[in-house]
Amino acid sequence: MHARLAASSLVLVVLCVGCGQSGPPTSPTSSAAITSTSSDAPGGSIAIPFKGRLEGEADPPVFEPPPSPFFSAHLVASGNATLLGRFTLDFSHRVNLNTLVGIGDAALTAANGDALLTHVEGQAMPAGSPTAFTVVETHTVTGGTGRFEGASGSFVVTRAVDFANPFTSGSIEGSIFAPSGKF
């Protein structure tokens, strides 16, 4: 009992210290630091916190012919996140100008080529100037490649974008479920 309590305390200290750093993570989370199984996790999967930051640039939107309220958008970003380390994001989506809702698909690819694949639903909200918006996107993990094969879970990307300047940056927070023995 004492050994189990000591091991649990050590894991808690390691997680608190790791999550308390002021900058973004610099390497993927080690599976050795993960010891608990979530009751919300599918079929014996392990829930792993997923946090990070990204920044990138959007391509100019492609508007559909009137009277359609839709345009297509493409974003390429890079960042740093737990599990992935340094990554690139490739995100294509379609936005309704009437509702400011966007739907699309994204791939977050780690430096070694392993990727998390997601379906994305987002909502833009005006943020000051007529061209500035805060975008909140829910990424639902639909699978992956390499070590992320069979992954599930979801995370939220909250980012700022100004269409007068295609630069965007933001944060990532959620949980990824790893099939037993993965990550």
Segments (PLM) and residue ranges:
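Beta-strand-enriched cores of mature, soluble protein domains
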Residues: G23-P28, A32-F183
